Each structure stands twice: as C-alpha cells, then as structure tokens.
Amino acid sequence: MTELRPPLPPFTRETASQKVRGAEDGWNSCDPEKVSLAYTPDSYWRNRSEFIKGRSEIVAFLTRKWVKELDYRLIKELWAFTGNRIAVRFAYEWHDDSGNWFRSYGNENWEFAQSGLMQRRLACINDLPITQADRKFNWDRSGPRPADHPSLSDLGL
C-alpha cells in the first residue's frame, strides 16, 4: 500500500505553500522519526557536503543535528514551484553547547513522488554567528511558529 502525504503534486501556489509550512512545522518539532516520515523510504539528500539515503540515515542525521543545534527554530519560505518540484529559502537560529548563537541561511530544492512524499532534497546552507540580542526567532519552542509571526521577507532576511 502506498503512503500518501497530501498535498500531492502537481502543486499550485496554495498547495506548495502548504507543503512548505508542513515541512517547517515538522522540522521545528525536532523529532527525527516524525520528520523522516515525510520522505520516501529511499529518499536522497545532499545536505551541505553530506549525502544521505533512506529514512534510517535521515533519522541518524537529524538526531546528530539536533544534539548539536540547540534551541533550534526554523522559518521556511516558498521561492518557486512547478509540477512535482518546490524551491524554498530558509533561515534557522540555534546555539551550540558553549552558548554561541548562529543564524543559518539556505536554499532547498525538493522533488516529490506522486504520493506527496519527498524523494529528493538538495540543501545549501551557510552559518552566520550572531549575538543572542540579534535573534529574531523567539516563539515558544513547545509548538510551531505562530501564524502571526513575521515571515523571512517580513523580517528583512
């Protein structure tokens, strides 16, 4: 039986935006198992210089990531879409175990199977050291980014 993860391709502006917000909310949960279920069992990723294949490697990667990137908060924004592909830009804030804060900026290219599961994720990311006073993502970590929180564009990022 095929797993379905609506919305399904081909995407419209509305359904692509729903997919982006769903991915943001999933990643902000910092739950590797939950996040991995949005991807095909054989999903292929390039994240920075790391190559990842399949859900078990996704879970291992995200587990390592969120042990290092503490108080993680992410905002994604739709950049472009066509057919079964979506391009997003994103920024996330986090600190390391020494209390050093960062804002990481990036772009992702996503390709989806007809099931709505992501089959390919290609990400380029750069880290910028910031001070705690420079932080812009301050919502309560117990839930997703509030609907009325400014977008990346609204924040000038």
Task: Map each language-model feature to its residues.
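Short, low-complexity N-terminal intrinsically disordered segments enriched in polar/charged residues
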Residues: 1-41, 148-157
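Short helix-capping and hinge/turn segments at secondary-structure transitions, especially at repeat
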Residues: 28-29, 40, 44, 63, ...
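A beta-strand edge to alpha-helix "cap/lid" segment located at domain peripheries
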Residues: 1-11, 60-157
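Short solvent-exposed beta->alpha transition segments
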Residues: 44-63
